[in-house]
Curated annotation (Swiss-Prot):
Official protein name in the record: NADH-ubiquinone oxidoreductase chain 4L
Primary location class: mitochondrion
Subcellular location: Mitochondrion inner membrane
Enzyme class: translocase
Gene Ontology CC: one annotated term: mitochondrial inner membrane
Bilayer topology term: Multi-pass membrane protein
Signal peptide: none
PANTHER family reported in the protein's UniProt record: NADH-UBIQUINONE OXIDOREDUCTASE CHAIN 4L (PTHR11434:SF0), NADH-UBIQUINONE OXIDOREDUCTASE SUBUNIT ND4L (PTHR11434)
Source organism of this protein record: Otaria byronia
Keyword Methyltransferase: no
Entry keyword set: Electron transport, Membrane, Mitochondrion, Mitochondrion inner membrane, NAD, Respiratory chain, Translocase, Transmembrane, Transmembrane helix, Transport, Ubiquinone
GO biological process, one term: ATP synthesis coupled electron transport
Transmembrane segments: 1-21, 29-49, 61-81
Length: 98
C-alpha cells in the first residue's frame, strides 16, 4: 500500500473515529460525515485512474452527488432543529417523531 492510499485511509479512519466520539452535536457529526465522503471520493477516483477502470469512471461523480444531497438534507435538518430548540444536540432529534 502506497503512502497516498495510507493517508487517505487514515483520513477516513480519523473521520469515522470523530463521528463515533463527537456525536452529541449535529454539526460535528455532519462535518465528520463530509470528511468520510471526501476521503472515499478521493480514494475511489485514484483507484479508478490507477487501474484504468473506464467503465467505473462515473462512480466518483455519483458518490459526490449523493454526498451533496446528504449535506443539503443534513444542513436543512440542522437549521430546523436549531431554530426550533435553540441547540444542535442530537438528543433533540428524538422529539421530532410523530
Amino acid at each position: 500500500m502506497s503512502m497516498v492510499y495510507f493517508n487517505i485511509f487514515m483520513a477516513f479512519t480519523v473521520s469515522l473515529v470523530g463521528l463515533l466520539m463527537y456525536r452529541s452535536h449535529l454539526m460535528s457529526s455532519l462535518l465528520c460525515l463530509e470528511g468520510m465522503m471526501l476521503s472515499l471520493f478521493v480514494l475511489m477516483s485514484m483507484t479508478i485512474l490507477n487501474n484504468h477502470f473506464t467503465l467505473a469512471s462515473m462512480a466518483p461523480i455519483i458518490l459526490l452527488v449523493f454526498a451533496a444531497c446528504e449535506a443539503a438534507l443534513g444542513l436543512s435538518l440542522l437549521v430546523m432543529v436549531s431554530n426550533t430548540y435553540g441547540t444542535d444536540y442530537v438528543q433533540n432529534l428524538n422529539l421530532l417523531q410523530c
